[in-house]
């Protein structure tokens, strides 16, 4: 038996963590909407930058806390102490690096998704002062769907052949992303939105920050609601790629869940920070495609060259290097005006 055969954080022993972590996240979200963003307003660049730093700092603090907790808890776990040659310090370091790598990977993939946010907000005519509210409730939905996807992914990975399937999905997704053209996004053709309109009348005008509007005793949905539904559907499709990608970094559900949630929490402020400049990163999709292909190859093939576990520090370096290079090259070689995608 080796360390890779044993779960470091089995759900039976750490169910309390999931409850406490989820409760803490919900509390943060309540404070965010009820205290810091009670009134609808346009999020300034300074405010977005401050909150981006705050969420990132909280993620790093959690990473450090997880490292310290691992140093304390692992020696008290008889399952781990029964593993020949188990090194507590090395295992704790591995946990911290896996969290950090998963967080960076999810945040990087989210940047590519921001272009969709910009287009959708523009399509539905959502003013900047109401965009935070849409993203707030969108993230609550994203947290729920991610939890479901992560639970399913964790259950499926008990079958070893599913690792190859996940790896194959990431490789195919990466290749498709690399060679796909930038197509115009048209929410009007979305089947889910058509279904919503069939069962719920929709107004053509906004009614403040409300998702619903009652007129003559009849309930109507507003464009804000349609925008929220479309973003939720987009996030579900996004999760199909991102969740397997993080399972390519670590197969510990606790690390996958926490790193994923922290990345999502920082997504709103990161959106307002980068929304005006996201179109500049035109080479980012190629960097992300390389990262997805790399993670897929790691799951399906490369791990076998390293006793079943590709070095996490090398994984982090490759992901940061590729993403950083694609961003820098995008700025050094800007896209020509006639190459801008239609929106």
Show which residues each predicted segment covers:
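Multi-pass alpha-helical transmembrane bundle typical of ion/small-solute transporters
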Residues: 1-343
């Amino acid at each position: 038996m080796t360390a890779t055969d044993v779960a470091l954080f089995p759900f039976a022993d750490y169910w309390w963590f999931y409850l406490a972590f989820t409760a803490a996240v919900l509390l943060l979200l309540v404070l965010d909407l009820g205290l810091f963003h009670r009134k609808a307003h346009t999020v300034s660049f300074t405010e977005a930058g401050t909150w981006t730093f705050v969420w990132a700092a909280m993620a790093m603090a959690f990473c450090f806390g997880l490292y310290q907790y691992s140093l304390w808890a692992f020696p008290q776990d008889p399952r781990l102490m029964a593993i020949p040659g188990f090194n507590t310090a090395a295992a704790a370091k591995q946990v911290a690096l896996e969290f950090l790598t998963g967080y960076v990977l999810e945040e990087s993939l989210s940047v590519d998704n921001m272009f969709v946010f910009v287009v959708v907000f523009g399509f539905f005519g959502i003013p900047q002062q109401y965009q935070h509210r849409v993203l707030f409730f969108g993230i609550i939905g994203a947290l729920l769907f991610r939890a479901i996807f992560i639970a399913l992914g964790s259950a499926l990975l008990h079958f070893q052949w599913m690792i190859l399937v996940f790896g194959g999905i990431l490789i195919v997704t990466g290749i498709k992303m690399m060679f796909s053209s930038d197509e115009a996004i048209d929410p009007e053709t979305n089947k889910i939105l058509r279904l919503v309109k069939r069962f719920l009348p929709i107004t053509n005008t906004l009614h403040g920050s409300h998702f619903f509007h009652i007129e003559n005793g009849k309930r109507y949905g507003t464009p804000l609601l349609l925008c929220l539904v479309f973003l939720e559907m987009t996030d579900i499709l996004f999760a199909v790629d991102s969740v397997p990608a993080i399972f390519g970094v670590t197969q510990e559900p606790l690390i996958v869940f926490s790193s994923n949630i922290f990345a999502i929490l920082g997504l709103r402020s990161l959106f307002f920070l980068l929304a005006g400049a996201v179109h500049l990163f035109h080479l980012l999709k190629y960097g992300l495609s390389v990262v997805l292909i790399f993670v897929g190859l790691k799951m399906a093939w490369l791990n076998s060259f390293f006793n079943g576990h590709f070095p996490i520090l090398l994984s982090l370096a490759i992901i940061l290097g590729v993403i950083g290079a694609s961003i820098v090259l995008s700025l050094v070689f800007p896209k020509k005006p006639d190459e801008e995608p239609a929106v």
